[in-house]
Amino acid sequence: GLEFLLFGSGPVNSTGVEAGAFLNPINPKDLSYIQAFFIPSMYMYADTIGVIKEDYGMSITTVMTKPKSRGFVKLRSANYKDPPEIHLNLLSHEEDMKMMIAGQRFFLEVLKTKPLSNKIEKIIFPDLDNLEDRNLEEHCRKSVKTNYHPSGTTKMGADNDKMAVLDSRMRVRGIENLRVCDLSAMPNINSGNTSAPAMMLGLRCADLILGS
């Protein structure tokens, strides 16, 4: 912060994500299932790839935009004070794993391609000489984590959908005068950032309330 105030430079001078990309590394003509972030810092946890000594660098993160893996939340006990058990089951679906492996391999190949490779001193990755599926899968499972844009926890749906908390007018079933109009109401997440859909849901809910 002080470097930016004094000289107008330093990490605070960055937006945090300098560039991004949407792609489908398995079928480029199909919908994009990977969103990539290009971050101007060494963005990696010490327990996944080791302590990074380099001061300057760039990180690329690959994010699944439409994951098929499903986790669950269940009660830990009959005591309401006990926190629930949360099982994310990240990358448990075979197609998610295939897409993540393809995304990792795609960007590693990009970084090794000229003329970009001429500007790169070092690529930090467990084993650059062995990009077989098994090794990439191991890396993905060690470094996978959740990202932004949680949604769909109180989704809209048809009357016969037992998992649908809300009706089509965003009203909570079984409770009068209560609606949910944030991203929780989305039945499915969109393939990308959720700011615009969140605003749209709020606007639509306001129209529904005023109309009723």
What positions do the PLM features span?
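FAD-dependent oxidoreductase catalytic-site/capping-region signature
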Residues: 2-197, 205-212
